[in-house]
């Protein structure tokens, strides 16, 4: 797992260590292919109470709800602030969504900030 924190928006700079711990915990649960930051932090219009929206691309994310719960269990020891919204998806499913022109995932890929890649 490679962290790309040079891409981290200024609004999340104080959370750099927390994010690194979160990504490491997630990677232990299920090896990460990529993590995209999307939403207000990626757009640059986050408020102090904004959550951190993450699209998590992982091979084991076939069952989205179970994957999100698994990632949350891995993150339990990490402080609850900021709040996270997790959208797990497999690489194959993400490719299908992209090909189908899915608006949500097209926006994540176009406007999102890549924070994690495979080594």
Where are these regions (language model features)?
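Short beta-strand->loop micro-motif that forms the acidic, two-metal-ion catalytic signature
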Residues: 53-57
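Catalytic core of pol beta-like nucleotidyltransferases
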Residues: 1-34, 43-48, 58-119
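Glycine-rich beta-strand-to-loop/alpha-helix junction loops that act as flexible
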Residues: 38-40
């Amino acid at each position: 797992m490679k962290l790309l924190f040079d891409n981290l928006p200024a609004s999340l700079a104080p959370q750099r260590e927390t994010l690194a711990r979160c990504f490491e915990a997630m990677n232990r649960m299920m090896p990460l292919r990529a993590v995209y930051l999307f939403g207000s932090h990626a757009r640059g219009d986050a408020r102090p109470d904004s959550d951190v929206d993450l699209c998590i691309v992982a091979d084991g994310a076939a069952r989205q709800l179970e994957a999100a719960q698994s990632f949350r269990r891995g993150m339990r020891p990490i402080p609850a602030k900021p709040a996270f919204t997790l959208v797990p998806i497999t690489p194959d499913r993400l490719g299908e969504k992209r090909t189908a022109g899915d608006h949500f995932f097209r926006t994540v890929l176009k406007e999102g900030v890549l924070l994690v890649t495979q080594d």
